[in-house]
Regions:
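Conserved PLP-enzyme active-site core in the AAT-like
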Residues: 9, 69-274, 279
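Conserved small-domain helix->loop->beta segment predominantly found in fold-type I
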Residues: 263-322, 341-349
Length: 376
């Protein structure tokens, strides 16, 4: 079955009681036992499972893993909760290799939460496979990949990272938030786990927070993540699951529009005299263009650019836009712009002349016109 059909119909059932086409929202926290004490209908308590979460998890597994029947997913209350569950599956003394430019929330989590728990991390430039290989230790248990990266849109060869991880007896996890399964499916490059902030492209409407981990059903690592989901309880509400699944139904058409708009903006910015650099893998001169073209079906809706004149000039551009919204996050219908270094704080390595853009679903000509007047 093609991806568009999976997105539109996976885990969809006509309500047997009413014939309703849209799924109901099951707000119940608890479910009735049979007379013999069994739960023949499959649900016990909504922290453990819920019909809305079950449908969302089934759909996510199909989106990332296809119809092989071997993929499963665990939904969480946020992308950070999903990420934390992967790291919680490790043990004190385990070693992680992570990108040196990974999402600042993930970097802080590893440094400030899991380092005191005894989890060691090496932050490495993952565009340099040899550097990653040199970072492997006897206690390496996880190679964490983010591609495209945030906010410089570096591209990592997922298959190469998975091979390095597996040769060391470690797992490879890929944060696929920026690409979405519409554009990139890390399992096809031998990743073991795929992580999402479903807040972003999957839900797609800036109105629900969530996360997910997708893995192989028979993987001990993934089963550990599932146990953490159950016992620690950072799960999404039934309504959050319902909203996310509703957003997924339009994911393919949205991602095509995001990608097309971003490509047009990137080409405009590349030719602008007030822009010193554009970071977008769809540009032929991007260092990771060839890898992105191989492992992605399109180049996505995120880009960043650096403004000639430094921090003050970049801040002035962000202040001068009229259509773009000055806000963090990404993947929604509205175009967002932010001065990323200000968000990440004093320890950031992000250039202070850089603006990150989440390109929305507006007309590309209108967006270009807005940036043109803001750049001057």
């Amino acid at each position: 079955m093609n991806f568009e059909t999976i997105a539109a119909q996976a885990a969809h059932q006509i309500d047997p009681a009413t014939g309703a086409v849209a799924p109901p929202i099951y707000l119940s926290t608890t479910f009735e036992r049979d007379a013999d004490g069994e739960y023949s209908r499959g649900f016990v308590y909504s922290r453990v499972d819920n019909p809305n979460r079950h449908a969302l998890e089934e759909c996510l597994a199909l989106l990332e893993g296809g119809e092989t029947g071997n993929a499963a997913s665990a939904a969480f209350a946020s992308g950070s909760a999903a990420t934390a569950a992967v790291f919680q599956a490790l043990a004190p003394g385990d070693h992680v290799i992570a990108p040196d430019d990974c999402y600042h929330g993930t970097s802080r989590m590893l440094r400030e939460v899991f380092a005191p728990w005894g989890v060691e991390t090496s932050f490495v430039d993952m565009t340099d496979a040899d550097a990653v290989q040199r970072s492997v230790r006897p206690n390496t248990r996880l190679v964490w990949v983010e591609t495209p990266s945030n906010p410089l849109l570096k591209i990592t060869d997922i298959a190469r990272m998975a091979a390095i991880a597996h040769s060391a007896g470690a797992a490879c996890a890929c944060d696929n938030t920026w690409a979405s399964p519409m554009l990139q499916r890390p399992f096809e490059s031998d990743a073991d786990l795929v992580v999402h902030s479903t807040t972003k492209y999957l839900s797609g409407h800036e109105d629900v927070t969530g996360g997910a981990v997708v893995g192989r059903e028979d993987s001990p690592f993934f089963q550990r993540v599932r146990l953490i989901q159950n016992l620690c309880g950072a799960v999404p509400s039934p309504f959050d699951c319902w909203l996310t699944l509703r957003g997924i139904r339009t994911l393919p058409v949205r991602m095509r529009a995001h990608s097309a708009n971003a490509g047009q903006l990137a080409r405009f910015l590349e030719d602008h005299s007030q822009v010193s650099a554009v970071h977008y893998p769809g540009l032929p001169d991007h260092p990771g263009h060839d890898i992105a073209a191989r492992q992605m079906s399109d180049f996505g809706g995120m880009l960043s650019f650096q403004v000639a004149g430094g921090r003050e000039a970049a801040m002035a551009v962000a202040a001068g836009v009229k259509l773009f919204v000055r806000a963090t996050s990404l993947g929604g219908t509205q175009s967002l712009i932010e001065h990323r270094a200000s968000i990440e704080g004093p320890d950031t390595t992000t250039p202070d002349d850089l603006l990150r853009v989440s390109v929305g679903l507006e007309n590309a000509d209108d967006l270009i016109g807005d940036l043109a007047q803001a750049l001057g």
